[in-house]
């Protein structure tokens, strides 16, 4: 077998009959499989050992040779080669067909490649191939031309003969009629009898005339057909064809079936045809030109690839190796077999029957029928069901053909090549492990023993607990006591990977150091639940074991959970305290008025109380029970840094140093909280709402190394749980308080609602107005009940505490629980004007319960649909962007995009742009940012973090030019500088990072949170699509629902207001032609926008509009934006529109991820005029390739090609990729492979997918060449330092943050002999 690491590209082409015979190890002649008595393969059958190799290692069929020493000998009795049995997986056979057949992919695919090549309509092609019509394959024009006059004379003679015969017959009949009439006259018969005789006579004469005319017409038809006879002409009438052959057989040849197609292809001159088509394209117009373009694609493919089109008609069919279509015996003595064997058997049976019929010299009609059946059976083998009814097996199930084995989720590509099952893995239920450090997980003992079995066995032998591996294995299986000690030793420092399905983004797999735990559940650290989206209601997780040293190093350095605190989508920490931890920290940092031990200033009769000289003294007081942690006190601090303003005031320019004392007015709880933060972090004297905690951790992530952040969040977790248990926050029925004012509030709104009802009954309001009025009334009522609820609840109510701290839930839920549910929607998404007045505490009435179920059920159904849709969106995004990898450090481009940092107000103050987090943050600056005085605030090439952005805003800079992947000029992939900071690490992105996949995951992962519904926006006739459908619409570059026209030019508007439509005319400023937009529906309102005078109002007559401005409400069509404003604008438009959907759901994704996808959508150019290049007009070419080819042509003095940028949807863009392996494994497998084979496509293996498929390391991350062969030679210092890094034990998490390291260990004193 080939080793995958030794080839650089993979080519696919058409196999000719010669190729098939060369691959083959012998011909399969019989349809038999195995002998039912001996269960051994039949000779010459589908499992024959002589063709495919022996079924048992080193053993021939008859048993004459039975040892390795006979390797390579071919047995003279049975003809089987003595070799390994696994050759039955790779040796192929073939079937020699008695008549050629066409390959269904090339005849039946859309468009039909055979039809395009031969210029035949697919309908005609089908008639020829399936023996319904004859086709003329060649005509001897010269001979026909030379002998035409002779033949014409012969024809005239024949016609004359027919006419003479006719005239003679008529003459005779007329005479007979005369005689008969005379006879009747003589007999004196009645006029009636005479008329009868005359009529019958005339009728017979008419028949003679008709018969002769038919004969003449037939001769005329034959002659006309013959004179106009041309190759590729169809003759459906069999009698006509027979006549032609009888008369003029030597002047032409014709046939039916695949043989005729084969002959036509043989006579086909590809070069001449290509030249002729190019000529038509240059000079033709309309349909003719389009047809020629399509045909040229196929013809040029054969011309350039050097493929022979003969490969589309097969003389032999390959038989795949028997191990790939196995036959296994079931317990009942029956056999289960692959469907392919049935399909092959039908081919062989029909083929053998055809051979026999031909040998017997059977009539043509019988032979043709058999040939047609052979063609159909080969079709079924290649692609069952593509034409006609599929061949079915037992129970009417369509058999799986070769094509079916490749396509779809269960096909070869997606099932076995892109997703494989792996060894060294296990799965179990997860439970919470609050005692774990962030980088640890609890692994059940039994599972660990099974996973690490080989390691344990090896170590047992090393330590002399066992004599050999076999006894070590027995020890492990019997779980001897010494096994556990060895297991502890083996798993130390050996990380394992945990994965929770669905893995929506890269944080769905993280590495942890295992800790052995009792029981059978995996313990998971509470802070990584957010990233895994895990909870402990029965979720399961899978464990995988990295084996090699490299894999372990990667797991430890790149995947360890404490190195993955930041979200790759937004660059903000994911490992944050949640739920109980938030409640605990909130409780700890709350200040309660008048709590025990509160500070009181000195008075006449008493000294001041509640002042402490150190946190330790305060803690002692709390332990004695005289001080509450939530009481306000004064305390002298020396180890905690004061807040910035106090520091400036007290310590001046030098700043605070550890040990400097200052007095803080705060609570003991807040001091305890601040002691958890890193040394030197300014004191935070606030109540810790979840948002405040988040901003602190954000800040830590910006300023401190990851390791410090990891330790801090761990400490916060411990404190959070500790204080949550002491806060006594529980929920019971007694805590759900119903506001006493609820009844009177509802009564007054009832009265208002009754008034509206009365007006409706009187006819003062129509149905819609009544509904709107009622909805308004009850919305107000709900809000007021909520307000009353708020006031009624005491501050220490646990339910309110949970909501207020931001731990979970929101006030709406509290209102539903204790106040009233309010209005609910019907299945259409409209409010039902009857409110649910009860709260869940009181219980709903039957009617209320019923109307409430609508919304609840719709929500559940929505969620299910959304998950599937979102998963499919992610799959398409990954596919389109999978080969975007950081390829170089800097592409040196001068281009970039301008991002807004702030908006300047009229009074000169700056308002920070709300979207700065996702636009400017974490980018590389493209030009120096200079303030008004000309000082450089941030230099070009600097990374914009939070401090830099603050500096720019302080200097009054409102917008900067940054580098962006949209303007990156790297050929394949992007450069690190244009991409900027990697969101997940907070540093510049590494070369080799698969930023395309990260982008796809960042956009796809929140997909499940987006809504499914289309919003009905006031006044817009069409529904505005929102949520997931809108994101799909944008990425697929579809024309949006409720499409709004955009201004093609800058100019003044003339608005004409008709009955049902608007008509807008724009008079351009530059005096060019007016642009008219007709038939604009009034249901879609005119757009509101800022005018030149700064006012915001609806578009009206005489307004001035800029190019690209939207004229109506709705969404602009991205293709129009591209046409009117060019690629740069459409990129910005798409990014902005996608962000709007995500922001509406409160999801933060950085622009750069969306930009990566948009860049892939605009990678191609469609050729308008090919100039002197090889490109075909109308074809889609990669921009880089297009520019390179143009440069080459111009250098040689030719005409460059002209093209225009085109926007492709993500599905289309993934199918248009250069890699046929990647495209085939995505969708429409057979179509992609058909095309690739005709074009003799070569896959350069640049992307990730194609390398995964063939089993090479992917060219990203550590698989990239520059990282592959790294030799590590430690320096002396490193050797010394290697032993000073403390292990991940408790002292590492000591309060001094491990800044002190031990001294270097003198290694020379240690003996490195075996442990024994």
UniProtKB/Swiss-Prot annotation:
MF terms (GO), sorted A to Z: DNA binding; DNA-directed RNA polymerase activity; magnesium ion binding; zinc ion binding
Chemical reaction(s) catalysed: RNA(n) + a ribonucleoside 5'-triphosphate = RNA(n+1) + diphosphate
Cofactor info, note text: Binds 1 Mg(2+) ion per subunit.
Binding site for Mg(2+): 535, 537, 539
EC number per UniProt: 2.7.7.6
Binding sites annotated in the UniProt record for Zn(2+) 1: 60, 62, 75, 78
EC main group: transferase
InterPro entries referenced in this protein's UniProt entry, alphabetically: DNA-dir_RpoC_beta_prime, DNA-dir_RpoC_beta_prime_bact, RNA_pol_asu, RNA_pol_N, RNA_pol_Rpb1_1, RNA_pol_Rpb1_3, RNA_pol_Rpb1_3_sf, RNA_pol_Rpb1_4
Pfam name, any one: RNA_pol_Rpb1_1
Functional summary from the UniProt entry: DNA-dependent RNA polymerase catalyzes the transcription of DNA into RNA using the four ribonucleoside triphosphates as substrates.
Stored PANTHER family: DNA-DIRECTED RNA POLYMERASE (PTHR19376), DNA-DIRECTED RNA POLYMERASE SUBUNIT BETA (PTHR19376:SF54)
Protein name as annotated: DNA-directed RNA polymerase subunit beta'
Organism the protein comes from: Mycolicibacterium paratuberculosis (strain ATCC BAA-968 / K-10) (Mycobacterium paratuberculosis)
């Amino acid at each position: 077998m080939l080793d995958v690491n030794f080839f650089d590209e993979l080519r696919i082409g058409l196999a000719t009959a010669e190729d098939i015979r060369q691959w083959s190890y012998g011909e399969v002649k019989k349809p038999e499989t195995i002998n039912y008595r001996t269960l051994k393969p039949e000779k010459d059958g589908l499992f024959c050992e002589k063709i495919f190799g022996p079924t048992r290692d080193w053993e021939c069929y008859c048993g004459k040779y039975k040892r390795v020493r006979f390797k390579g000998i071919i047995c003279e009795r049975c003809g089987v080669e003595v070799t390994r049995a696994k050759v039955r997986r790779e040796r192929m056979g073939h079937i020699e067909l008695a008549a050629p057949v066409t390959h269904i992919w090339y005849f039946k695919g859309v468009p039909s490649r055979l039809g395009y090549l031969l210029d035949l309509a697919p309908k005609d092609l089908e008639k020829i191939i399936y023996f319904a019509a004859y086709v003329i394959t060649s005509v001897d024009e010269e001979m026909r031309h030379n002998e035409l006059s002779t033949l014409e004379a012969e024809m005239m003679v024949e016609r004359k003969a027919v006419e003479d015969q006719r005239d003679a017959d008529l003459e005779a009949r007329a005479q007979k009629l005369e005689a008969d009439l005379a006879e009747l006259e003589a007999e004196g018969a009645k006029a009636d009898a005479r008329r009868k005789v005359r009529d019958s006579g005339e009728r017979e004469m008419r028949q003679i005339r008709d018969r002769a005319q038919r004969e003449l017409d037939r001769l005329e038809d034959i002659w006309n057909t013959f004179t106009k006879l041309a190759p590729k002409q169809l003759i459906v009438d069999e009698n006509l064809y027979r006549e032609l052959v009888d008369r003029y057989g030597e002047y032409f040849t014709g046939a039916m079936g695949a043989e005729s197609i084969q002959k036509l292809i043989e006579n086909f001159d590809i070069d001449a045809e290509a030249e002729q088509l190019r000529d038509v394209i240059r000079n033709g117009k309309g349909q003719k030109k389009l047809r020629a373009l399509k045909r040229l694609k196929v013809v040029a493919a054969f011309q350039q690839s050097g493929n022979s089109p003969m490969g589309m008609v097969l003389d032999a069919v390959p038989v795949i190796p028997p191990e790939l279509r196995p036959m296994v015996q079931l317990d009942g003595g029956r056999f289960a077999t692959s469907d392919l064997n049935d399909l092959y058997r039908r081919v062989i049976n029909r083929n053998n029957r055809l051979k026999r019929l031909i040998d017997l010299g059977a009539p043509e009609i019988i032979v043709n029928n058999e040939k047609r059946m052979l063609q159909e059976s080969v079709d079924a083998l290649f692609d069952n069901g593509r034409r006609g009814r599929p061949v079915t097996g037992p129970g009417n199930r369509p058999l799986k053909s070769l094509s079916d084995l490749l396509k779809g989720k269960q096909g070869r590509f997606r099932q076995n090549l892109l997703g494989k099952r792996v060894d060294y893995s296990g799965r179990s239920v997860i439970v919470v492990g609050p005692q774990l450090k962030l980088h640890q997980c609890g692994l059940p003992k039994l599972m660990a023993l099974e996973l690490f079995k080989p390691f344990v066995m090896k170590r047992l032998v090393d330590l002399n607990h066992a004599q050999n591996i076999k006894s070590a294995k027995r020890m492990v299986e019997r779980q001897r006591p010494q096994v556990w000690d060895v297991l502890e030793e083996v798993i130390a420092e050996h990380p394992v990977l945990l994965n929770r399905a669905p893995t929506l983004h890269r944080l769905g797999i993280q590495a942890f150091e295992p800790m052995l735990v009792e029981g059978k559940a995996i313990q998971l650290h509470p802070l990584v639940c957010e990233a895994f989206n895990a909870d402990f209601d029965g979720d399961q997780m899978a464990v995988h074991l990295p084996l090699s040293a490299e894999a372990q190093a990667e797991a430890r350095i790149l995947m360890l959970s404490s190195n993955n605190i930041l979200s790759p989508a937004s660059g903000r920490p994911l490992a944050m305290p949640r739920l109980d931890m938030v409640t605990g920290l909130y409780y700890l940092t709350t200040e309660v008025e008048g709590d025990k031990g509160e500070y009181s200033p000195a008075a006449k009769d008493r000294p001041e109380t509640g002042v402490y000289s150190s946190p330790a003294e305060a803690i002692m007081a709390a332990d004695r029970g005289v001080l509450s942690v939530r009481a306000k006190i004064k305390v002298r601090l020396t180890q905690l840094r004061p807040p910035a303003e106090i520091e400036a005031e007290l310590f001046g320019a030098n700043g605070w140093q550890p040990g400097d004392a200052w007095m803080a007015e705060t609570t003991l709880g807040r001091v305890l909280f601040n002691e958890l933060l890193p040394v030197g972090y300014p004191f935070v004297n606030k109540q810790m709402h979840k948002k405040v905690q988040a901003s602190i951790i954000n800040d830590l992530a910006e300023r401190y190394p990851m390791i410090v952040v990891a330790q801090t969040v761990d400490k916060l977790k411990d404190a959070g749980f500790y204080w949550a248990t002491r806060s006594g926050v529980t929920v019971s029925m007694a805590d759900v308080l119903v506001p006493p004012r609820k009844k009177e509030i509802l009564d007054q709104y009832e009265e208002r609602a009754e008034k509206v009802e009365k007006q409706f009954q009187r006819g003062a309001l129509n149905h819609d107005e009544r509904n709107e009025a009622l909805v308004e009334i009850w919305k107000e009522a709900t809000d007021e009940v909520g307000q009353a609820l708020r006031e009624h609840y005491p501050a220490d109510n646990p339910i309110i505490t949970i909501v207020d701290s931001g731990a979970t839930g929101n006030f709406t839920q509290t209102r539903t629980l204790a106040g009233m549910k309010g209005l609910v929607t019907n299945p259409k998404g409209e409010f039902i004007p009857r409110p649910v007045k009860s709260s869940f505490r009181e219980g709903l009435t039957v009617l209320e319960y019923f109307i409430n179920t609508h919304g609840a059920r719709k929500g559940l159904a929505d969620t299910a649909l959304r998950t599937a849709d979102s998963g499919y969106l992610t799959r398409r995004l990954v596919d389109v962007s999978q080969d975007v990898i950081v390829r170089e450090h800097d592409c040196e481009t001068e281009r970039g995009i301008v991002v807004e940092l702030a908006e300047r107000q009229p009074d000169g103050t700056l308002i920070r742009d709300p979207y700065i987090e996702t636009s400017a943050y974490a980018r590389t600056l493209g030009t120096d940012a200079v303030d008004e005085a000309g000082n450089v605030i941030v230099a070009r090439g600097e990374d914009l973090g939070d401090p830099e952005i603050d500096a720019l805003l302080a200097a009054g800079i409102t917008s900067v030019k940054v580098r962006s992947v949209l303007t990156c000029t790297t050929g394949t992939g992007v450069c690190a500088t244009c991409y900027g900071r990697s969101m997940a690490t907070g540093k510049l992105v590494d070369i080799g990072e698969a930023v395309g996949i990260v982008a796809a995951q960042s956009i796809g992962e929140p997909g499940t949170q987006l809504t499914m519904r289309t919003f009905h926006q006031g006044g817009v006739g069409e529904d505005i699509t929102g949520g997931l459908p809108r994101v799909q619409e944008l990425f697929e570059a579809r024309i949006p629902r409720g499409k709004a026209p955009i201004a093609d030019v800058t100019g003044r508007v003339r608005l004409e207001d008709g009955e049902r439509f608007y008509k807008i005319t724009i008079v351009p400023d530059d005096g060019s032609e007016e642009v008219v937009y007709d038939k604009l529906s009034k249901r879609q309102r005119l757009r509101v926008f800022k005018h030149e005078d700064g006012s915001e109002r609806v578009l009206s007559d005489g307004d001035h509009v800029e190019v690209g401005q939207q004229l109506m409400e709705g969404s602009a069509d991205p293709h129009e934006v591209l046409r009117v404003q060019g690629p740069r604008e459409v990129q910005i438009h798409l990014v902005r529109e996608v962000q709007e959907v995500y922001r509406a759901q409160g999801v933060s994704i950085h622009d750069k991820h969306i930009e990566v996808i948009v860049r892939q959508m605009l990678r191609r150019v469609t050729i308008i005029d090919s100039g002197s290049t090889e490109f075909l007009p109308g074809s889609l070419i990669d921009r880089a390739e297009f520019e390179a080819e143009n440069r080459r042509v111009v250098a040689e003095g030719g005409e460059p090609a002209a093209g225009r940028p085109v926007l492709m949807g993500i599905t289309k863009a993934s199918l248009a990729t250069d890699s046929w392996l990647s495209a085939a494994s995505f969708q429409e497998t057979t179509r992609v492979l058909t095309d690739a084979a005709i074009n003799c496509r070569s896959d350069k293996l640049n992307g990730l997918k194609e390398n995964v498929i063939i089993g090479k390391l992917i060219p990203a991350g550590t698989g990239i060449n520059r990282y592959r062969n790294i030799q590590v030679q430690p320096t002396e210092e490193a050797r010394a330092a290697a032993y000073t890094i403390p292990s991940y034990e408790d002292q590492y998490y000591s309060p001094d943050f491990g800044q002190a390291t031990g001294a270097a260990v003198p290694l020379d004193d240690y003996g490195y002999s075996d442990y024994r």
